[in-house]
Curated annotation (Swiss-Prot):
Subcellular location: Cytoplasm
GO cellular component: L-cysteine desulfurase complex
Designated name of the protein: Cysteine desulfurase IscS
The species this protein was found in: Haemophilus ducreyi (strain 35000HP / ATCC 700724)
PROSITE patterns hit by this protein: AA_TRANSFER_CLASS_5 (PS00595)
Encoding gene, per UniProt annotation: iscS
Catalysed transformations (reactions): (sulfur carrier)-H + L-cysteine = (sulfur carrier)-SH + L-alanine
Length: 406
């Protein structure tokens, strides 16, 4: 077993060797390097064909028509394009948007920007298990609601929202429904027809493909219109201008093809490893799982635990042989407690002591067992240094202690 161990697959994944091999054929003068928009010669035609094949692989994985796939630079851009694009196009119908407090920052910050432009946004509270209560969603809908944006799988706590039911609610009321599916594509069966989704964002680097490329599904029936946010050349049916990066698109297509083929065998293996990790941690006192652990309500690759009476940052230092994260990679640089955990009602102490373990293609049983032992050992050591742990063990109710500020 090689150290350090990588258990941060929800932040990014290494590229699959098969993806790299495929991409190498689309870069040099001996390969297919043409611009797919060059319609007058073979170099362009070959590049365009490669893009079409990749587009088909991506559409196949999510049950879409290949004409409904728009390439972007990644899921953050896809979220921006979907939310701003739909809000701007349909603003004459209304200016009210509904989302969830635990969404990715790419959704929340985009909504904040729209608020500055005069849109109104309702940020719904999730339940304590991280899931959205659909009656609260229905109650929040107004006559001027034009867009609802709810993620499929949460990037921090891995809970799976009932996208199908939300899709039905939106269709019945003719409200546009956007889903950030960055953490679910390739891990859960996703079919945009069944889920009644209008716009869906997804990424490549969370699925063993290259960074810097992603996609947005834009429904054709019923036809959804969005206003472009990048102009110049009218690529991607006018929705996203810019020369298509063929090698990245081919890499993403190959990654999605592999995912479709191997998902059925890969996910049960990863679920078994995740459950092994979870049961290994059960032996530790005062540990709490964040988000629902109910069957079907959590993605099989995610485990987010809070270890009470231990500071998350010091635990991360003790676990430097294991790549894990506190919060999401996009926000873990700030020492603020995770806004996702605060939204599900965790106090500051538990939010600060949370660690996200996310598993993927190359995680092994040996690595999981090593992780369990190292976490146990580190927690015992850190708690020995904690006066709060000592007081807790003596039966003192810490919530009743009055602290003096110097």
């Amino acid at each position: 077993m090689k150290l350090p161990i990588y258990l941060d697959y929800a932040a990014t994944t290494p590229m699959d060797e098969r993806v790299v091999q495929k991409m190498m054929q689309y870069m040099t003068k001996d390969g297919i390097f043409g611009n797919p928009a060059s319609r007058s010669h073979k170099f362009g035609w070959e590049a365009e064909e490669a893009v079409d094949i990749a587009r088909n692989h991506i559409a196949d994985l999510i049950g879409a028509d290949s004409r409904e796939i728009v390439f972007t630079s990644g899921a953050t851009e896809s979220d921006n394009l979907a939310i701003k694009g739909a809000a701007h196009f349909y603003q004459t119908k209304g200016k009210h948007i509904i989302t969830l407090k635990t969404e990715h920052k790419a959704v929340l910050d985009t909504c904040r920007q729209l608020e500055r432009e005069g849109f109104e946004v309702t940020y719904l509270e999730p339940e304590s298990d991280g899931l959205l209560d659909l009656t609260k969603l229905v109650e929040a809908i107004r006559p001027d609601t034009i867009l609802i944006s709810i993620m499929h799988v949460n990037n921090e706590i891995g809970v799976v929202q009932d996208i199908k039911a939300i899709g039905e609610i939106c269709r019945a009321r003719k409200i546009i429904f956007h889903v950030d599916a960055t953490q679910s594509v390739g891990k859960l069966a996703v079919n945009v027809q069944e889920l009644k989704v209008d716009l869906m964002s997804f990424s490549s680097h969370k699925l063993y493909g290259p960074k810097g490329i992603g996609g947005l599904y834009v429904c054709r029936k019923p036809r959804i219109r969005i206003e472009a946010i990048i102009h110049g050349g009218g690529h991607e049916r006018g929705m996203r201008s810019g020369t298509l990066p063929v090698h990245q698109i081919v890499g993403m297509g190959e990654a999605y093809r592999i995912a479709k083929e191997e998902m059925a065998t890969e996910m049960p293996r990863l679920k078994a490893l995740r459950d092994r990790l979870y049961h290994g941690f059960q032996a530790i006192e005062e540990v709490y799982v964040n988000g629902s652990m109910e069957e079907g309500k959590r993605v099989d690759t995610n485990l987010n635990m809070s270890f009470n009476f231990v500071e998350g940052e010091s635990l991360m230092m003790a676990l430097r042989d294991i790549a894990v994260s506190s919060g999401s990679a996009c926000t873990s640089a700030s020492l603020e407690p995770s806004y996702v955990l605060r939204a599900i009602g965790r106090n500051d102490e538990l939010a600060h002591s949370s660690i996200r373990f996310s598993l993927g293609r190359w995680a092994t049983e040996e690595e999981i067992d090593y992780t369990i032992e190292l976490v146990k050992k580190s927690i015992l050591k850190l708690r020995e240094l904690s006066p709060l742990w000592e007081m807790f063990k003596e039966g003192i109710d810490l919530s009743k202690i009055e602290w003096n500020h110097h």
